[in-house]
Amino acid sequence: MRSSIDVHNHLLAEDVVHELSQLAGPLRDLSTAPGVLGLPPVAVGRPTLLADEDGAVVVLAPADAEVDTAGVAELLGRDRLDPVPPDRAPGLTGYLLAFVPPVALECPSTLVVDERVASQDVVYAAAGEPGVILKVRGADLVKATSAVVAPVTRQAS
């Protein structure tokens, strides 16, 4: 399994200024991070992992939003993209499903960032393990990863 050290080393190699913060306790997933950290949901990019025969797609969406998976597949022209089940995520990415980071995956991957998250000065995202969070400038993350930025979410009801 990979860890936040892999995320840190990847971002260092790309000259991306970032912070990894140890949390007081582990999060179940990033949907609870805004309340724990005192942040608006749009500042926390919660990962959704999709995959097809061409590799993985990590979608960062506001913590309170649902990803439009069909919309992401259409946006990327990859109609066979499907959500990755929790038991398959570690073998594919090297990380537990709820904590898949935006970088340093073991497989080929594309990063898609919802435009509301990408527009934030600072984005908080999974760092690869339950008790650690990644803090990075939204523009730096998009630039370093050549992320696709688009409106790919719908508000959770």
Question: What positions do the PLM features span?
Answer:
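Extended, low-hydrophobicity, polar/charged segments
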Residues: 1-157
